[in-house]
Amino acid sequence: VKNLDDMVELFKDMKEICPTDDSGNPTYAMSLWPDWDGNYVMYVKSMATAYYGYDEFGFGHYNPETGEWYYAMDNGSPYLEMLKFFNTLYREGLLDPDSMTQNYDKMMEKVQNGGVFFSIFNYAGSAGFNSPEHIAENKIMRSLVPEEGAPIAYGMSVYGGNRVWSIGAK
């Protein structure tokens, strides 16, 4: 899998092989939840971060390699490119139509039942799907990074961020 277009084709193939989950419900490439949305559609923003290796900074993405900042609404921005990707998934029937109305718990039920093929978050993907039962049936969700993908490692920003480690004295 080289790029986002290849991912769409892979997801189409997966849906053809596995059109329903363990409970007989339709399967989807991805399932989102709006509970955590803020300035952006959180999952779309996070997919841009995961794919391009650019971190969220203000209302845009920051490239830690070059120092460039991309305003989210500029043509060709990582965020708009990911919105186009998710629109393609939607038009192909690969994006869960409940994505903008369901909560995290409902989305996780779908993951646990095998109704979701991919997640950029381990806690909302493999950690939820890879149960002892699924593993015994040789049903396993694993990581996939397209060749053109460049995931970011958090904690490297010289500008700070919203990740904090703390400990109380009492």
Located regions from the model:
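Extracytoplasmic/secretory soluble proteins
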Residues: 1-170
